[in-house]
Amino acid sequence: MAASLQAAATLMQPTKVGVRNNLQLRSAQSVSKAFGVEQGSGRLTCSLQTEIKELAQKCTDAAKIAGFALATSALVVSGANAEGVPKRLTYDEIQSKTYMEVKGTGTANQCPTIEGGVGSFAFKPGKYTAKKFCLEPTSFTVKAEGVSKNSAPDFQKTKLMTRLTYTLDEIEGPFEVSPDGTVKFEEKDGIDYAAVTVQLPGGERVPFLFTIKQLVASGKPESFSGEFLVPSYRGSSFLDPKGRGGSTGYDNAVALPAGGRGDEEELQKENVKNTASLTGKITLSVTQSKPETGEVIGVFESIQPSDTDLGAKVPKDVKIQGIWYAQLE
């Protein structure tokens, strides 16, 4: 921004007009007045002819417009960079926007927020239906060895390699509030999985399927948790570069005869594709609720396995932290 404002100031500086060599520019009084600058001392006079004065005035006005335009654009750009993520909106505010107002802003990848309400879970005991359940990750870490030699495995910060399409939304399921204050949620339907790829500090990329399929979570509103299903990142019909698949393709790598070297133990995990599902665990916590509208928001932490490349690799633990939103009816 400083560089842009300096460039704007450079454009607004008066320049000498080389029409006649015998003319000397003694004052910038007219230019100063154009910019609203009052001269405190050293009043000078300028003996330019009328046509030269008009030309200088036009140049001054043009430089003024260009300078202010450049300065304004610099402020806009710097403000956008400082803002980072878009402002979090309520559910009604999101619904009131058109497609073009949402497109390219990042709002579609955000869960709604709540205005007002209370800082606890304030719903009466009973059976509800959770709708518009949304989970928005804000952090992805992967358990792996550090960059330094002989470092113990720990959750490492990662860099997101996919687009902003990792939020789960429109999830539905029964939500029960018991008289003792405990809650129970069962995931039944919705956009409950998203393919995500992150990169470790060493450059290794870790794909995984962010999901809460068949989640059954129970406990106090401050911390209710449960296990869920993590399907295989690839389906059984996926073929690897050598044409091998779970339900189709070659049984062994091309040019390796069946019953021979292709069935050796070290190659078995590559030849025999495994599409079995794994399990993950998530813990959710309510931070704010609004009973009059049925809205509730909170934070979550999920630990699930990464992709196994159809059984050829050992999965890594992926920790996902973020916020969630739901409407109870």
UniProtKB/Swiss-Prot annotation:
Keywords for this protein: Chloroplast, Manganese, Membrane, Photosynthesis, Photosystem II, Plastid, Thylakoid, Transit peptide
Disulfide bonds: none
Pfam family, one: MSP
Subcellular localization, as worded in the UniProt entry: Plastid, Chloroplast thylakoid membrane
GO CC terms of this entry: chloroplast thylakoid membrane; photosystem II oxygen evolving complex
Stated role: Stabilizes the manganese cluster which is the primary site of water splitting.
Family: Belongs to the PsbO family.
Name of protein: Oxygen-evolving enhancer protein 1, chloroplastic
Annotated source species: Solanum lycopersicum
